[in-house]
Each structure stands twice: as structure tokens, then as C-alpha cells.
From Swiss-Prot:
<dbReference type="GO" id="GO:0006207">
    <property type="term" value="P:'de novo' pyrimidine nucleobase biosynthetic process"/>
</dbReference>
<comment type="subunit">
    <text>Monomer.</text>
</comment>
<keyword id="KW-0472">Membrane</keyword>
<comment type="similarity">
    <text>Belongs to the dihydroorotate dehydrogenase family. Type 2 subfamily.</text>
</comment>
<dbReference type="Pfam" id="PF01180">
    <property type="entry name" value="DHO_dh"/>
</dbReference>
<dbReference type="GO" id="GO:0106430">
    <property type="term" value="F:dihydroorotate dehydrogenase (quinone) activity"/>
</dbReference>
<feature type="binding site">
    <location>
        <position position="133"/>
    </location>
    <ligand>
        <name>FMN</name>
    </ligand>
</feature>
<protein>
    <recommendedName>
        <fullName>Dihydroorotate dehydrogenase (quinone)</fullName>
        <ecNumber>1.3.5.2</ecNumber>
    </recommendedName>
</protein>
<feature type="binding site">
    <location>
        <position position="211"/>
    </location>
    <ligand>
        <name>FMN</name>
    </ligand>
</feature>
<dbReference type="InterPro" id="IPR005719">
    <property type="entry name" value="Dihydroorotate_DH_2"/>
</dbReference>
<feature type="binding site">
    <location>
        <position position="166"/>
    </location>
    <ligand>
        <name>substrate</name>
    </ligand>
</feature>
<feature type="binding site">
    <location>
        <begin position="240"/>
        <end position="241"/>
    </location>
    <ligand>
        <name>substrate</name>
    </ligand>
</feature>
<keyword id="KW-0665">Pyrimidine biosynthesis</keyword>
<dbReference type="InterPro" id="IPR005720">
    <property type="entry name" value="Dihydroorotate_DH_cat"/>
</dbReference>
<dbReference type="GO" id="GO:0005886">
    <property type="term" value="C:plasma membrane"/>
</dbReference>
<keyword id="KW-1003">Cell membrane</keyword>
<dbReference type="GO" id="GO:0044205">
    <property type="term" value="P:'de novo' UMP biosynthetic process"/>
</dbReference>
């Protein structure tokens, strides 16, 4: 069905097509949806039905949680959400590079605020594994950034299976500086301290996950993993989008500012994943994302060290059948 809809959707502005597709999910007939039977994965104290989940960014406010759940994901990650709602960057801010199965976005953490997301999650019927991705508001300076993350962490704790700290988006000014040295260590120290309090308050432990950039040096990644191990962070998502344009040079829209995702990100993000595996071994769960649009690319992520996978851009180009193709293919291995 998606193969019939895609040419029509691709005639629309990318952000309008994105919104329309999410709306249409609510009206698809029941036979279109399926439950995937895969190989369970035990990670971060959770049992994932299979390896393929949805990356953050598709449903920022949790408005489409039940509809997305019917596509067969093992887990769904919502967000990025910030303490206060914000409009994000001016439009247009989402661009397809169809020739390369790629997307450039400079959305800028547009969302309705953490309170709206929590209410949407509470009203949904979804009972599966739920990640919630948290960030800081644009106007919050770096010295106060930890306050934004702590605020969101407290708000979402009782509604999340795990919480992702997004400090790697290229579309919020200076955000990636939070991956550096003292900023990073102080942020994780405060979140770990709060995690202990919240676990006692709610009677359950919710793992923290860090989403990293593919554009950092090997040395920076090593420093980050040392801090991640020091503070008992249980997962790393590798990776966010890249600022590099080497893989799409001279293609339409390639000069647009923002983060590049999709097939051209595959090699860079997988290299990062492989390095992270060397640095953390089996002490931290690695979630591979970036360029997965086939069974082959999914296998490459797993071979590089990923225990779990997330898709987003591949879903835009291949449709929900991508989930089935990967899960059934991995089952056959």
C-alpha cells in the first residue's frame, strides 16, 4: 500500500507529507497492521520483543502512539521533548534527497512541551516499551541546560521504559557542546543522582540512554564513553544526524543546513557504533540507527555491535514493510 502512496506523498512538501502520513495511520484498515514475532532481546533490564524500534523525531508529542504501535515496532521512542513548547526553526526545515534515500532536517526541537507529551502518553492504550527523548529549550543557556533535562526527566520518569538524553542534535545552537568534558560529566552526574531518587519514589528503575553525534572525533567518543561508564548509563544510541555533506555533494538540497540522515549516514554512523563497541564492550547496550533501510544494513549494524536497531528515514523511503523485512530476515539467520 505504501508503494502506491509514496509517489503522491513525495509531491508534497516534506513536512506536510510527514504530518499527512501520521494522520493517515489512524485510518488504515486493521488488516494492514501486524504483530511481529521476532527474537526477544534482553537489554537494560527490559525485554524487547525483537530488535527493530522507531527512532525519535517521527512523533514528537506522542499524538500517534497507538497508530504507530500497530506497525509492529519492538519499541517506540517519542520526542525530542523540552520543558516548554517551542515552534522550532522557520519553515521550510525538512528536505528530501530522494536520489540518495536521504533527508536533511533543521526542525529545532519543535514540540508542544513535556506536559502535553505526558498527557498524550497517559491517554494512549500502548503498553509496549516506550522511550522518551528529552532535550533543552533553545533559549536555555548551557550553564542551565541540566535544569531542563532534570525537569523533563522528572516529568516523564513514571511513563517511560527508558529515557534518552539528546545532546547531539545539530539544530539547536551549541547543544553539541554538552557532549564535551565538564558539561557532559556534570549533566550525567546530576541525572544519575536524580535517577536514584526517582527510582525510590516510583519503585522502579528507568534506564538512561545517551544519543551521540557521528561527527565527534575518536578521542571525544572515548572521553564520552569513559564518563558514560563512570555514571552507569545503560545505553547509547549511535547515532544522531550528521553535518557532513561529503556523501551527497552536488545533489539537490544538499546545501541546506541541518542534520543529514538516511542511507548516506550509514557508513559514518556504523563506524561510530563499531568504535563505541570497542570502548564499552558489553557494559552498555548499543542501539544502532542511521541509514538502516534494508535487511543488509540492519545486519551491518548488528555486526558492528548493536543489540537493538531504530529506523526513521528508511521508513520514509521504504514504508512499514521495512520493519517486517528486517525482523523476518533476522529470524531466518
Amino acid at each position: 500500500m505504501y508503494s502506491l502512496l509514496r509517489p503522491l506523498l513525495f509531491r508534497l512538501d516534506a513536512e506536510k507529507a510527514h504530518s499527512l502520513t501520521l494522520s493517515l495511520l489512524h485510518y488504515l484498515p486493521g488488516f494492514y497492521f501486524r504483530k511481529m514475532a521476532g527474537q526477544p532481546v534482553h537489554a537494560m533490564g527490559l525485554v524487547f520483543p525483537h530488535q527493530v524500534g522507531l527512532a525519535a523525531g517521527l512523533d514528537k508529542n506522542g499524538e500517534h502512539l497507538d497508530a504507530l504501535a500497530k506497525l509492529g515496532f519492538s519499541f517506540i521512542e517519542l520526542g525530542t521533548v523540552t520543558p516548554k513548547g517551542q515552534t522550532g526553526n522557520p519553515k521550510p526545515r525538512l528536505f528530501r534527497i530522494a536520489e540518495a534515500n536521504a533527508i536533511i532536517n533543521r526542525m529545532g526541537f519543535n514540540n508542544s512541551g513535556v506536559d502535553v507529551l505526558v498527557e498524550n502518553v497517559k491517554s494512549a492504550n500502548y503498553k509496549g516499551i516506550l522511550g522518551i527523548n528529552i532535550g533543552k529549550n533553545k533559549e536555555t543557556n548551557l550553564n542551565q541546560a541540566a535544569d531542563d533535562y532534570l525537569y523533563c526527566f522528572r516529568k516523564v520518569y513514571d511513563h517511560a521504559s527508558y529515557v534518552t538524553i539528546n545532546i547531539s542534535s545539530p539544530n539547536t545552537p551549541d547543544l553539541r557542546q554538552l557532549q564535551q568534558g565538564d558539561y557532559f560529566a556534570e549533566l550525567l552526574a546530576q541525572l544519575q543522582k536524580e535517577q536514584i531518587k526517582l527510582a525510590d519514589q516510583y519503585g522502579r528503575h528507568v534506564p538512561l540512554v545517551v544519543k551521540v553525534s557521528p561527527d565527534e572525533t575518536d578521542e571525544t567518543l572515548k572521553q564520552m564513553t569513559d564518563i558514560i561508564l563512570q555514571y552507569g548509563i545503560e545505553g547509547i544510541i549511535a547515532t544522531n544526524t550528521t553535518c557532513s555533506r561529503e556523501m551527497v555533494k552536488n545533489l539537490p538540497c544538499s546545501e541546506e543546513q541541518g542534520g543529514l540522515s538516511g542511507r548516506p549516514l550509514m557508513e559514518l554512523s556504523t563506524r561510530c557504533l563499531r568504535l563505541l563497541k570497542q570502548y564499552v564492550g558489553n557494559d552498555v547496550t548499543l542501539i544502532g540507527v542511521g541509514g538502516i533501510d534494508s535487511l543488509e544494513s540492519a545486519k551491518d549494524k548488528i555486526n558492528a555491535g548493536a543489540s537493538l536497531l531504530q529506523v526513521y528515514s528508511g521508513l520514509v523511503y521504504k514504508g512499514p514493510e521495512l520493519i517486517h523485512d528486517i525482523v523476518s530476515g533476522l529470524n531466518a539467520v
